[in-house]
Design a protein with these regions (language model features):
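Residues at the starts of beta-strands that form the adenosine-phosphate
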Residues: 7, 47-49, 91, 119, ...
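Short phosphate-binding loop-to-helix
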Residues: 56-110
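N-terminal glycine-rich phosphate-binding loop and ensuing alpha1 helix
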Residues: 3-53
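Short, hydrophobic beta-strand segments that form beta-sheet elements in well-ordered domains
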Residues: 48-54, 121-123, 187
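Glycine-rich phosphate-binding loop signature in dinucleotide/nucleotide-binding domains
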Residues: 4, 86-91, 115-117
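Conserved core of the sugar-phosphate nucleotidyltransferase
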Residues: 103-176
Length: 212
């Protein structure tokens, strides 16, 4: 099977009350809210693209029919899993973070090529800063994800390509590292998470410092 034989949906989870930067999905860049810019960039890659959100305020900025309302959810993966029945026609569901302002097809393609052959794939760029989420990996497999300034690992990017059965089981998985509060750690111990290197030259909008 190759990437041309599978049906892919990009799904962007977006909550209104973000914890570190208030209502960041609605912050405007060049006159457009962040969520709309990320949505448009993904949509223009040629993939069916959706936003799953708890906010009518966010939903109104998205093409009619492509915003799906959810209840309260603990993280983005859980938000997608809560409305999985909306994506029955797709072979792969790609979770792209709504704060990835500079997302490009060049960033996404290595993840998609890998996930054709695997259950879960995510990605990294070489090197990391102390405040980055880090992935420690070996031979293409994730061993651990952490926010801690451990002094090693690579910068983890918030992109995940899932086979639907992973999302179907997500709420049943125990989180072996609850102190990290990282959604992907819940999958570790149940399934291998493949990691691939990619390129991402932009920012992720997480704090006020990222706005300048």
């Amino acid at each position: 099977m190759n990437i041309d034989d599978i049906k892919i949906a990009i799904v962007i989870p977006a909550r209104l009350e973000s914890s570190r930067l208030k209502q960041k999905m609605l912050i405007k860049f060049d006159g457009e809210p962040l969520i709309r810019l990320v949505y448009d960039k993904c949509r223009l890659m040629g993939y069916d693209t959706y936003v799953v959100t708890d906010s009518e305020e966010i939903a109104k900025h998205i093409t009619i029919g492509n915003a799906i309302m959810t209840g309260d959810c603990e993280n983005g993966t859980a938000r997608i899993a809560s409305v999985l029945d909306k994506f029955k026609e797709y072979d792969i569901i790609v979770n792209v973070q709504g704060d990835m302002l500079d997302i490009t097809k060049k960033t996404l393609d290595p993840v998609l090529r890998d996930c054709v052959h695997n259950d879960v794939t995510t990605c990294y760029t070489k090197g990391c800063k102390p405040n980055d989420v880090k992935v420690i990996h070996q031979e293409g497999h994730a061993l651990w994800f952490t926010r801690a300034p451990v002094g090693y690992g690579d910068r983890h990017l918030g992109i995940y390509a899932y086979r639907p059965h992973i999302l179907r089981s997500y709420d049943l998985f125990d989180d072996e590292y609850p102190q990290e509060r990282l959604e992907q750690n819940r999958i570790l111990g149940h399934y291998n998470i493949q990691v691939v290197e990619t390129t991402y030259d932009g920012v992720e909008i997480n704090t006020e410092q990222d706005l300048f």
